[in-house]
Amino acid sequence: MMTYSITNRIRRLRFDHGEMTQQTLAEQAGVTRQTIIALEANKYVPSLLLAYRIARVFDVTVEEVFPLHSDSPEGGAGEAGA
């Protein structure tokens, strides 16, 4: 069975958007600075609503902020090159 993990690119996006502070992002997303800190440290998985709010602040898709990664090895038996 495949398992997945979600990471985030919030810190990089803040830097790319004029070195936006955690406080500014928090205010624009309607959360506390502590929430942004927890998200950046991958200690908290946001609700779908919060994920959309953060994506809108940066004018990107949710997946650009929170990419989904497969924790299972790619490929498998019988998928090797010919």
Locations of regions flagged by a protein language model:
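Recognition helix of helix-turn-helix/homeodomain-like DNA-binding domains
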Residues: 31-45
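Short basic helix-loop element that most often maps to the first helix and adjoining turn
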Residues: 9-27
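DNA major-groove recognition helix of helix-turn-helix
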Residues: 14, 40, 58, 69
